[in-house]
Amino acid sequence: GIEPQILDYQTQQYRLFPLLATAYALYFAGNYMSTAYSEGSQKIEKGQLEELPQLHALSAGLKAFTSYAASAGVEVCRICCGGHGYSHASGLPKIYVSVVPACTYEGENTVMMLQVARYLMKCYKDKQQGSKLPGFVSYIAEIPEKRSGMDEHLSFNCLVKAYKHRAARLIEEAAKQMQSLIQSGSPAHEAWNKSSVQLFWAANAHCHLFCVQNFVENVERSSGNTKTNEVLKAVCQLYSVHGILENLGEFIHDGFLSAQQVDYLQKAMFKLFEVIRPNAVALVDAFDIPDQVLQSCLGRYDGQVYQALYDYAKMAPMNQTEIHSTYYTHLRPLMNPETSNYSKL
């Protein structure tokens, strides 16, 4: 019979499709940063430095957020390939060792996140003083909704609001924790250290919100093939929904999401798997990464996985002769006592 395809198993979809959605979210985030850097450089040359703190905070945060996501994602892909995932034939070990160092070079990720947190604390202080917050961080000053209006349709507007609520709440809690410690007599640096985990949570939520909101904005202004847009919309929705379910405690902590709404999210995720499945391979191929770069027996354009694994095994040095040399040097003497130099027991 026909061999079942790995992607038809829901457990594989649950692990791999959110990573596919993440790849698209990070792609759009990268495009945003490239444009922001180019425009920011021109403004700096003109002496316009107002947006520099926000650009620094966002770039530092995305460096950490994206490298964490990539390194964890490669490991999930490797596990999904079973034993072959640990072989160099899969190409995944090479990707893993090239991605993981990004978590520490050019700034260890925790330090990068705390730089974001420092900027967010300044924004929160400005909000308390009645100052207008710039650009993307303006959500911190918005009047928070106590309950989500999300229904089974899971509109992008409701999903983004959920991420805004989570980030704003975590920022406020971190700021109040620091203020409480300082008022209790702790020096500022000590209060910062004792609040650093909450500060990290706040910065991470801020970066996650950016990736979701930026992805949504790109999808909503996209034009062209309607069917392609529908698929991209499903990918974006999966990224948003899965992100909430993976960090559910931070979304239901203060009762913002109800049990019924969580049920909507779970059912939607499984439905989105069905929508994305027929297009999953095409969505990966759209990145147009050639086989020569991937060097993978598993992730191949022609799909000839078994033949590729066989050919890879034939190239191994130990498989260059029909009988390995160790047979003549070690095994055959043991099997022929008359010519053996080994002592008899």
Describe each model-derived feature in a short phrase.
Residues 1-345:
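Flavin-dependent oxidoreductase catalytic core characteristic
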